[in-house]
Amino acid sequence: MKVFDFPAIVSGDSPPQQFFGFPLFFLREMVYNGFIDYLTRMAAMRILYDSKQSQFKTPFGTLTPGQTCTLNIHIPASVLTTKVTCIFNNEDGSWAQSVEMAYRMKKGAYDIFQGRFSIPYPGLFFYYFYIDTKNGGFRLFKQGDDTNMEAGDLWQLSCVPADFTTPDWAKGATIYQVFPDRFHSAGRVHTEGKLEPYTLHKSWYEEVDWKPTAEGQVLNNDFFGGNFRGITEKMDYIASLGVTILYLNPISKSFSSHRYDTGDYKTPDPMLGTEADFSDMCRAAHARGIRVVLDGVYSHTGSNSLYFNREKAFPSVGAYNSKESPYYSWYTFYDWPDTYHSWWDFDTLPTVNKMDPAFIRYIITDEDSVVAHWLKLGADGYRLDVADELPDEFLRLLRDRVKQLKPDALLLGEVWEDASNKCAYGKRRTYFTGGELDSVMNYPFRTAILNFIKNLDGGRGFKETVMSIVENYPPQVVACNMNLLGTHDTPRILTALVDDFDGSREEKAKRHLSRNQLTVAVERLEMASFLQYTLPGSPSLYYGDEAGMEGYKDPFNRRTYPWGREDPELLTHFRRLGRLRKGNEVLRQGDIQFFQAEDRRVGFTRTYNGKTLRVYCNRSGDPWDIPSGKILLGHNLHTIAPDWLTLSPKGFCVTEEWK
């Protein structure tokens, strides 16, 4: 949280005297002792506090109500500190606490002050320090991993419910995301009952239909016939990647190929198959230790749906057809029937009133509600589309019902930013402090990995992003985080790593990576995916990325899987990563600590149950000599001495410390 004009809480009757944000006693020293001497003294007066290090704060990360937290701040003795106060506030100012920190000890040139406190209830809190000295007082704020006087950020501290748990099977899992129409087709493609018009491609390897209609509409109504049986047929292939969670994009009956325009929540799209086919797929997955997670699209429906029925393709009386429709209250009409609230102004996606009692009954609470229906058929959880648009009250009702039906079901939300402090539509969300979501899509990790791999960051930004998420999220959420590099909403990762082209759809359809670009992209993807699979959380592989698929954003990131045309070396690389992670509990569950994050080199440890792994990535142009250990996986790695290894440029490895 950025500080702009945050009021200070100070001791005594008089506020600190400041000039342009600096305490006057420092400015007086500038005058009395000279500018150079002032700068020297300021450099020597660096105050030490980093909430991510145990010497300054324990426990690490989030708290539960009533749990004791200990803070230690190191202040140079030359500051002549007389009192240190840590000031906590919740966001709306309804709760505040001032913790006076006691002098603990002197360590070298530093005085160490310590304070202990607890927080009474779940919520999001922020804090800073006020330091009294013999010459005056000043506030201390956060600046990256460092501190800064009178300007900067507040430290964040989340308090989560003590009974907030997440599914054990989802912790450290490996996820495989499938866009159902484009993965694999088996048997006859059923078109009976399919919403019209549609196009069925004659060849699996044809280009996706990217051209708009004569009226300028993009219909997304071209299909290749991927289905449940096709996924079942390829379940051994999916398992060979070390996958433990299969996440499917929407499967309900819909007009489009992406199926985010739901037509009938409780009916599978005819082209995908029947409910029996779906259950068979789930059983095949479960037999291989793979759970099935579905896409829950509860922010909007399709205009061509059982509920809205603008196109009159359903026998029901939809909200568009009559104000007496049982679904009329689901929607907001400004001028019925043609003017209504729609998702991002797409008139084919009318937005629903999430807290409408009839909608809640249909989706959540009825005996055969939508969430109950698919769980009974074999699903193990839901990824919630545009979670930011689902009210916290809706999410709590949904969680209660899902956990009642299947206590270890997974609820994963689509959130693009730091979900611990996310503000959406003017409201701070309570995904974790309210115990609503088990996990979220970890787009911040994706950004951090891409910036490091593309040499836009030397390593420090990567470390700051990773540790910020790990600190801000409860550990049970961190372990379930969906760590992705590519999805149906991003360019293919191979393309994203080397080509930021942003031309027209026609240009993108014709544009492909050159041989040189592809070589660089594959090299970068190998290291990016290595980081993805060695960080805390659950790596997620978008179908076909392991095969070398390329393409820009929708629809070019949704081409068909290239069966028989895969990149064999890349496929082997991802299988190795899958085996590494599946066979190593330290990577699935371990804590993380960085020991290197600059000069285009990243190094961190993963520790669990007394075992430590060391992870190295070298993006620099020079070799990196590292301590020897048991090599679990390595690339461009050489032994130079019994106790030392050399990691060449563009090399990466993970080693287990010798006992």
PLM regions and their residue ranges:
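Aromatic/acidic polysaccharide-binding cleft in carbohydrate-active enzymes
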Residues: 181, 425-426, 432, 438-439, ...
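Conserved, mostly hydrophobic/aromatic
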Residues: 73, 178, 238, 248, ...
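Active-site-proximal helices and loops of the catalytic beta/alpha 8
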Residues: 282-291, 299-300, 305-316, 380, ...
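Substrate-binding/active-site clefts of carbohydrate-active enzymes
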Residues: 179-245, 251-376, 398-405
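Short, positively charged and aromatic/hydrophobic N-terminal segments
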Residues: 9-12, 28-41
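Carbohydrate-interacting/catalytic domains
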Residues: 40-174, 179, 185, 191-194, ...
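Cationic, low-complexity basic patches in intrinsically disordered or flexible, solvent-exposed regions
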Residues: 18-19
